[in-house]
Amino acid sequence: MTSHSDRPESIPATSDAQPSAARRRLLYAGVAGAAALGGAGLAWWKFQPHAMEQGVEEALWAMEFEKPEGGVVALKSLAGKPLLLNFWATWCPPCVEELPMLNAFYRQQAQNGWQVLGLAIDQPSAVRKFLQRIPLEFPVGLAGLGGTDLGRSLGNLTGGLPFTVVLGGNGRVLHRKMGQITPQDLQLWAPLR
């Protein structure tokens, strides 16, 4: 005698059945969401300053850079006071946009001991031409492509610009920022020593 439950029409559907359209949409949405989160996380990580190379702070203060107008700027001459070190280039729109703000910060904070040094990752002739059009009150050093290596040693692994490093009067890195600075950044940094 066969039981009623042995009939094929009474056997429940197995997992071999096709998922419904609603389930497929949920599955696709979940996969797309996970991919978006992963991509956003990777982008965030890539543009964060990373660990600095060992001994870079000490080596930094021994460096000298030619100035566009002639002569050299020695970082050791800037030691003992807070320093905003900005890596920039004439061909970098966010760099050019933030320079007037950096110039105003320098003007306003110099009496509080602040110093600003711009390190141009650029050809000397391009920097000279640029500074004739847009003069800056703070000193500029011609870092060339070697400035990219210095930025990397300070934690800018992508070599992106602009890149800003804030150093305290004791010579230690207090803050690093990859990307264009904001007025809020400068307000946050101004009380640092």
Q: Could you tell me what each predicted segment is?
A:
Residues 1-22, 32-37:
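N-terminal secretory signal peptides
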Residues 30-62, 129:
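N-proximal helix/coil linker or "cap" segments that precede and/or mark the start of modular domains
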Residues 96-135, 145-152:
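Structural microenvironment flanking redox-active thiols in thiol-disulfide oxidoreductases
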Residues 82-83, 162:
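Alpha/beta-hydrolase fold active-site loops
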Residues 63, 87-88, 130, 138:
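Conserved hydrophobic/aromatic "anchor" residues
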Residues 86-92, 121:
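Aromatic-flanked redox-active Cys/Sec active sites in thiol-based oxidoreductases
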Residues 62-82:
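A short beta-strand-turn-helix
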Residues 133-136, 144-191:
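Thiol/disulfide oxidoreductase modules built on the thioredoxin-like
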